[in-house]
Design a protein with these regions (language model features):
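A short Gly-Trp-Pro
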Residues: 1-124
């Protein structure tokens, strides 16, 4: 089974996920842009049973981050964990987005991801 791991900028928070993700996406919504400080967020979703994290975390509006370095890390509930893929130790990652959200907010200079589903807003 594949194991991917990552950590925050200062190394205080570590995480790992096992197996293939349920889905892999890119989001261009205003919240993701502001939260990441970039034009989009690259993330994947795993079942909560295949996700582990260690170290002290802080939370804002359901999003977990390192209280020391401020790195945005993940969010989770009792079913799933959404991991910010930029924090994985392996770069580039072996993961390819299968969908894009909020493409109506995508920068004009960014091309759609080939073969990925495109959603004007959310998937539902």
């Amino acid at each position: 089974m594949t194991i991917l791991s990552g950590k925050c900028l200062c190394g205080q928070v570590q995480l790992s996920v096992r197996g293939e993700p349920l889905r892999i996406g890119i989001c261009h919504c205003t919240d993701c842009r502001q939260e990441s400080g970039s034009a989009f967020t690259f993330f994947a979703i795993w079942p909560i049973k295949r996700f582990e994290h260690h170290g002290e975390i802080a939370e804002f509006d359901g999003r977990c981050l390192c209280p020391r370095c401020g790195a945005r890390l993940f969010s989770f509930d009792d079913r799933e964990a959404e991991i910010k893929l930029g924090i994985l130790s392996e770069a580039p990652t072996p993961l390819t987005p299968t969908y894009e959200l909020w493409v109506k907010r995508r920068e004009d200079w960014l091309n759609p991801i080939e073969d990925a589903e495109q959603y004007e807003e959310d998937r539902w």
